[in-house]
């Protein structure tokens, strides 16, 4: 078995693999709304050959493809997300998955990538294999789904996000997310910005912040067409979070359903979504990150006088 980038000589095998329906173990935000499909192996390979920004690796045994993985850039070119992870060898599924992930890591190192992300079902074989391949668990995540029916009709303190809110939004992330998760993924504002996923939003979609006593305490992003949104709030900011949910409901009113992927550590967010009528779907997801550089220690922020607290 050989794991490598696809070659033009793999064309016949790629076409055959396209016809084999297998679960994509890499879960992206937009596929939570549209279904967890994946770029076809042939299309992904062509994108790589044409240098269109997608990286592709195949696991080959003889003339047959046993698995495929693809990765795409996030906000920054030096941050990648694995958006396809499919194995088609039931007898060696773990070996195929691990080889694909290790090949992705090698390619990321060669491209001077700093972060390689993977989201997969928590109970999937890929979650176990990711740990063996050197990925660190950032956080567990739950999917909320339904129709937002806020208990409040006011959205006091909520306004549209602007570029000037970037650092304040990063501080909300620092206060809302446990330090163990931040150490795995993003400890600086540059890292936090680099790993943000914008693929699930259209250009016309937006973001919100909510302020309390002159300070930003919650943030959200939303996609009107799919009804999907993110929600991050500081602990104890229940009232402000409810106001943020009210504003989201207004902007997503035309969507057939509303969905949000929220970290399991987000007690404030969970409570607000439950009050607004959303329900948690069965199962959970695990977000992993392979860091290819060491994070900046948080103590350096303290010396610089930047107020960042533990989550």
What residues fall within each predicted segment?
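Structural motif
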Residues: 6, 69-70, 119-122, 212, ...
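A short beta-loop-alpha structural element at the N-terminal edge
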Residues: 2-25, 157-182
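Conserved acetyl-CoA-binding loop-helix of GNAT-fold acetyltransferases
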Residues: 92-106, 132, 238-252
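Conserved donor-binding loop and adjoining core beta-sheet/short helix segment
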Residues: 16-99, 211-241
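Short, structured motif recognition centered on aromatic/hydrophobic residues
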Residues: 57, 80-85, 101-105, 143-145, ...
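Active-site/acyl-donor-binding loops of N-acyltransferases
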Residues: 121-123, 133-153, 258-311
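Non-catalytic interaction/regulatory modules that flank or connect domains
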Residues: 183-217, 224-227
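Contiguous mid-protein beta-loop-alpha structural module that forms a pocket-lining wall or clamp
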Residues: 98-152, 166
